[in-house]
């Protein structure tokens, strides 16, 4: 296993250069906040089936809260939030965001690694333990999830979200191409990523508004990238004696009317169904092939061949 602190310092260095969790301008009258706030509400209400009403009057801790641009929506729904973030610059932004869009004095801000928080002081103290888009960048996901789970009260909720391993495989193949062509030169990594995956970056910007460079730093410049599968996540929940409920994405089977993703008592069926969906989704790689063909350089041909090999293997399953 990679050294926890070495990985953390590398990640911190990257995210001090570009903060990937900045989605709107810090002005109440700027429509970018309202756009983002509505997207967050849609995600929780319809995607996660955990509507804003569930946050009202509850205590919540957010591990890896970043700039607070996401957490502030949960606060506006009535949660009393504790934000844990190792990037002091991002935490300063979070304080400003909460001052602008919430009642900052009702919330707490802790500048710390998630591994270094006072686990005795905060154990089972929160109605909701929350972390999204964080564990994919740590060296020990299982240990980090155990910490997250320990913070929730008995009968409380753990909300965990991250990239999926099938998307991670795509990104690892993309990283093979980028690093083969650009080496470790940060500027070259940015330029090659833009050249190779312009369409992909554009989709990311449209989906979650932020700068193109922020997307590139979050996906290709960052050194630590290790995404869990749905099966991994189910194991995390079971190992910590948590009831696993997932409502997004949905798999609706003909004649049943109910997605297995909403059945917390059928994790085996969920793992099987999720494996199929992950593999089908992973081979949908149209959009970048012409850009790949147009580049000549070390590693680009290998990247294309590897994509084809993976796709053929999955089609033969």
Predicted regions located by residue number:
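A short glycine-rich, Lys/Arg-flanked "PGG" loop and its adjoining helix->strand segment in the class I
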Residues: 142-154
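Conserved SAM-binding loop of SAM-dependent methyltransferases across substrates and taxa
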Residues: 67-78
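A conserved beta-strand element that flanks and buttresses the S-adenosyl-L-methionine
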Residues: 130
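Conserved SAM-binding loop
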Residues: 94-95
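Conserved class I S-adenosyl-L-methionine
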Residues: 157-198
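Rossmann-like AdoMet/SAM-dependent catalytic core
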Residues: 211-317
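Conserved alpha-helix/loop element of class I SAM-dependent methyltransferases that forms part
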Residues: 34-57
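Conserved SAM/SAH-binding beta-strand->alpha-helix loop
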Residues: 87
């Amino acid at each position: 296993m990679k050294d926890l602190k070495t990985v953390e310092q590398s990640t911190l260095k990257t995210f001090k250069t570009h903060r990937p969790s900045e989605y709107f301008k810090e002005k109440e009258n700027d429509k970018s906040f309202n756009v983002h706030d509505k997207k967050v509400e849609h995600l929780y209400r319809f995607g996660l089936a955990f509507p804003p009403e569930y946050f009202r009057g509850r205590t919540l801790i957010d591990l890896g809260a970043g700039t607070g641009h996401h957490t502030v929506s949960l606060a506006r729904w009535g949660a009393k939030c504790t934000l844990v973030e190792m990037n002091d610059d991002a935490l300063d932004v979070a304080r400003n965001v909460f001052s602008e869009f919430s009642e900052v004095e009702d919330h707490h801000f802790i500048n710390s690694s998630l591994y270094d928080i006072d686990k005795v002081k905060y154990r089972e103290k929160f109605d909701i333990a929350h972390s999204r888009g964080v564990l994919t960048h740590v060296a020990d996901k299982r240990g980090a999830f155990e910490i997250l789970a320990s913070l929730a009260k008995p009968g409380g909720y753990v909300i965990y979200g991250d990239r999926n391993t099938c998307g991670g495989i795509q990104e690892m193949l993309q990283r093979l191409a980028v690093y083969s062509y650009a080496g470790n030169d940060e500027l070259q990594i940015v330029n090659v990523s833009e050249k190779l995956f312009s369409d992909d970056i554009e989709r990311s910007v449209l989906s979650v508004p932020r700068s193109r460079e922020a997307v590139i730093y979050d996906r290709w410049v960052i050194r630590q990238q290790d995404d869990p599968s749905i099966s991994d996540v189910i194991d995390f929940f079971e190992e910590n004696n948590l009831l696993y409920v997932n409502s997004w994405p949905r798999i609706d089977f003909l004649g049943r009317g109910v997605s297995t993703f909403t059945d917390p008592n059928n994790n085996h069926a969920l793992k099987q169904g999720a494996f199929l969906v992950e593999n089908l989704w992973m081979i949908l790689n149209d959009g970048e092939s012409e850009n790949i063909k147009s580049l000549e350089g070390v590693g680009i041909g290998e990247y294309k061949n590897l994509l084809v090999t993976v796709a053929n293997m999955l089609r033969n399953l």
